[in-house]
């Protein structure tokens, strides 16, 4: 799928971030969402964030990420402001997470793993036009019919 990227600005790491995630990030950036960067993959995988404290952080989605051991990065996306405790695999968040790691690792193609309970791989390609292609396996979670009256 073809998505936009968003400008990212480094922001100060705060005590509120540490309280929300239970671990102090080593770096934080803000775009449409907040991305807190942690020291290692294990910290991201094992964290048990405080959903109420996450509500106090900037951005609509609160992301935790670290450089991966077998992938370029590992992440988790928490969305209490959207009434979603944790998004299993968040394409919208990776518009920013992959862009961040692309710059950090100096590469255009990023393989990301979202370490939620369900988990999933995202294959991200940063384009020169400021957009990103994201692919991966999708999981069908609902089927519905929409009924509309046409006049």
Predicted regions and their residues:
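Active-site proximal loop and beta-alpha junction motif in alpha/beta enzyme cores
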Residues: 1-151
